[in-house]
């Protein structure tokens, strides 16, 4: 279960649970620098480790030994309506993709450019449209460029270098199940 020392997985502003009870999610505040974000993340890690009573945090994106679906408990968020909706959503993911797929960890990030950047960019572009319109167009162009190269980005930085054999056990159609060590 979610360690009680970490507070409620449903309401804590910085520490929650992703899909499984064992898959913690850290939420850093908005910051203006990488160093500030790294400090916040370091503080969250230190606080969490102190609450885990000797349990270790797994730092790889792929889970270690997986003992079937029973070894991946779906996160509990309490009995409130919001908590129940989160549970129902995760049950649906379990049915659709399987619990093992939900145990893969990853980094989610949001970023934005400061408003002064867009104002200056609009001036340089000759103020042909509103700053808000330029900002919207700029972010949409960024997304288009990302998606045009997503295959390469995922190949270079999204692929895990190792996967435990237990992760593909029982799935003969998985390409990794063909490898026998």
Label the predicted regions.
Residues 1-94, 101-103, 134, 138-144, ...:
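Terminal catalytic/cofactor-binding subdomain
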